[in-house]
From Swiss-Prot:
One of its GO terms (biological process) is proteolysis involved in protein catabolic process. NCBIfam families: ATP_dep_HslV (TIGR03692), PRK05456.1 (NF003964). It catalyses: ATP-dependent cleavage of peptide bonds with broad specificity. Allosterically activated by HslU binding. It comes from the Bacteria. One of its GO terms (molecular function) is metal ion binding. The keyword Lyase does not apply. Belongs to the peptidase T1B family. HslV subfamily. The active site is at residue 7. Protease subunit of a proteasome-like degradation complex believed to be a general protein degrading machinery. This is ATP-dependent protease subunit HslV. It comes from Variovorax paradoxus (strain S110).
């Protein structure tokens, strides 16, 4: 049976004189094969008392399982993002059921942004931009160009990057959810 797939998630971290800005956004399209099943899915969430932002790309049911597991790790480790991410990937790699999950997470708090994969990777981007999912490459390119050539906020860059990805990627729509810290 085919799984629900297709999305774009982008996160931008930007330094300003007032401090770091971070935002994560995602589109709302869910596809089953080549059919759009839903256009208003919320793939970006606030976790751990609103202090952590998370977005997922991949199989929808798998991603919700990972959200729950990740939030439990955040609670266990008092909101320490990197520690919770490493502990989640350890479980993801060693648990027979979790190992079959097909999803990626983009997570961020006030100081750190990470990509968490089912391969056991916990990656911190060098430039503060994370982009995952089918339209990720388009959104990442747009975000990098906007960071280098504008004074837009992190949230504005995320919104514009998602819009650009939505114009190019057939698995990305224009219904966006964006959260910022």
């Amino acid at each position: 049976m085919e799984q629900f797939h297709g999305t774009t998630i982008v996160s931008v971290r930007r330094k300003t004189p007032q401090g770091d800005q971070v935002a994560i956004g995602g589109d709302g399209q869910v596809t089953l094969g080549n059919i759009v099943i839903k256009g208003t899915a919320r793939k970006v969430r606030r976790l751990y008392h609103g202090k952590v932002l998370a977005g997922f790309a991949g199989a929808t049911a798998d991603a919700f399982t990972l959200f729950e597991r990740f939030e439990a790790k955040l609670e266990k480790h008092q909101g320490h993002l990197t520690r919770a991410a490493v502990e989640l990937t350890k479980d993801w790699r060693t648990d027979r059921v979790l190992r079959k999950l097909e999803a990626m997470l983009a997570v961020a708090d006030a100081t750190t942004s990470l990509i968490i994969t089912g391969n056991g990777d916990v990656l911190e981007p060098e430039d503060g931009v994370i982009a995952i999912g089918s339209g990720g490459a388009y959104a990442q390119s747009a975000a990098k160009a906007l960071i280098d050539n504008t004074e837009l906020t992190a949230e504005q860059i995320v919104r514009k990057s998602l819009a650009i990805a939505g114009e190019i990627c057939i698995y990305t729509n224009m219904n966006h959810t964006v959260e910022a810290l």
